[in-house]
Amino acid sequence: MKIDPVELTKKLISFKSITPKDDGAIEHIAAILKKSGFECEILEFGDKVKNLYAKYINGVPNLCFAGHVDVVPPGELKDWISDPFKPEIRDGMLYGRGAADMKSGIAAFIAAIVDSVAGKFRFSGSISALITSAEESTEEHGTKAVLEWMKSKQKKIDFCIVGEPTSSEKLGDTIKIGRRGSATFKLICHGKQGHVAYPELADNPIYKMISILSKIKDTTFDTGNKYFQPSHCEITTIDVGNNTNNLIPSSIAAGFNIRYNNIQTLDGLYKLIDEICSSVTNDYKLSMQSSRNVFLSIPDRNTDIMLDAINKITGIDAVLSTNGGTSDAAFIKDICPVIEFGMINKTAHQVNECVSIDDIHKLTAIYKEFIKNYFYPTNKILNQINVIGNTPDGPLLA
């Protein structure tokens, strides 16, 4: 069975899978994989949020590809040059919501794994796919829930590739080997309401908040390290809720987010922010919520295999990066080593989201090359494994 990754991308775009709905995309992928001998489990969590775990069982190790079919809303339809859920090809580019993030990535790895299990070469090992419809929103019902289910069923993954759009300028220029953590803070400062003409009878909390936020913004959390940029804070909201211009408010709220590296800990960040607040006032309330923790996959043999695959197909020497936002790799790292690699991310979440047709084919070829060398290591690393024989299609592994 041969899958055209471009046609599959177009089909996936046609599903109006605005997060956390899949609109039939999960079932469509499962049907394709079942025809190729994969055992498929469609899992529903929460308010019928659908996920898929599919596995072609052929021993160990288990190489998994992961991704999400859900997309963010398209925004104003009038701003699109075509219907975001009716894929169109123009000048070698495929347009549609999810084209970059990340339906083309899913189509590429589905085409690659189907072709690999149906190919001429023999290999010892399993290939699986973990696909969710809840990456962009209700994360507790998506990949995180699937991994908990897998643990309960003693289903293991040895290595995972998340097909998120990691490339910046050209396909193959960036592999993500980790991600910064995200900690969101909410701060409320209290004061005493009063008339602006009698400030001595009131206590304006706005000045307290300004002082605290200034101190936080001026804080150097760290200077980064070999793998990570410095941790940094961005103030995202300030709200007084006061529409009266002669009234000193009784309270003020602010929100800010810290993207932190592996030098920091959540407890340490909270303690630092709390100390800054208490240095200004004792009348405040501070809370913190963490969505995804920082993680790092130390480069190893599998990273080298991906670097070689990218170079062979594109001629590009990829860089290893931890920049950018969070992803479900932050959950997967708790059960196995994980890297992220996929399409160019320039138009992700934007109006007129698009990807190159040529890049879809190249990404498929890169994934296929990785699969081949993951199970059939190249000569430079054959001495690291036990080879028990050779076939016309490559070494037969123990």
Curated annotation (Swiss-Prot):
GO MF entries: acetylornithine deacetylase activity; cobalt ion binding; succinyl-diaminopimelate desuccinylase activity; zinc ion binding
Keywords from the UniProt entry: Amino-acid biosynthesis, Cobalt, Diaminopimelate biosynthesis, Hydrolase, Lysine biosynthesis, Metal-binding, Zinc
Domain of life: Bacteria
Residues noted as binding Zn(2+) 2 in the record, renumbered to the chain: 101, 136, 349
Gene Ontology BP annotations: diaminopimelate biosynthetic process; L-arginine biosynthetic process; lysine biosynthetic process via diaminopimelate
Catalytic activity: N-succinyl-(2S,6S)-2,6-diaminopimelate + H2O = (2S,6S)-2,6-diaminopimelate + succinate
Pfam families: M20_dimer, Peptidase_M20
EC number: 3.5.1.18
Cofactor(s) the protein needs: Zn(2+); Co(2+)
Entries under SUPFAM superfamilies matching the protein: Bacterial exopeptidase dimerisation domain (SSF55031), Zn-dependent exopeptidases (SSF53187)
Pathway listed: Amino-acid biosynthesis; L-lysine biosynthesis via DAP pathway; LL-2,6-diaminopimelate from (S)-tetrahydrodipicolinate (succinylase route): step 3/3
Cofactor: record remark: Binds 2 Zn(2+) or Co(2+) ions per subunit.
Active site: 70, 135 (proton acceptor)
InterPro entries according to UniProt: Bact_exopeptidase_dim_dom, DapE_proteobac, Peptidase_M20, Peptidase_M20_dimer, Peptidase_M20A
Top EC class, one word: hydrolase
Binding site for Zn(2+) 1: 68, 101, 164
Keyword Flavoprotein: no
Record family assignment: Belongs to the peptidase M20A family. DapE subfamily.
Known role: Catalyzes the hydrolysis of N-succinyl-L,L-diaminopimelic acid (SDAP), forming succinate and LL-2,6-diaminopimelate (DAP), an intermediate involved in the bacterial biosynthesis of lysine and meso-diaminopimelic acid, an essential component of bacterial cell walls.
UniProt-recorded name of the protein: Succinyl-diaminopimelate desuccinylase
Taxonomic source organism: Wolbachia pipientis subsp. Culex pipiens (strain wPip)
Chain's gene name: dapE
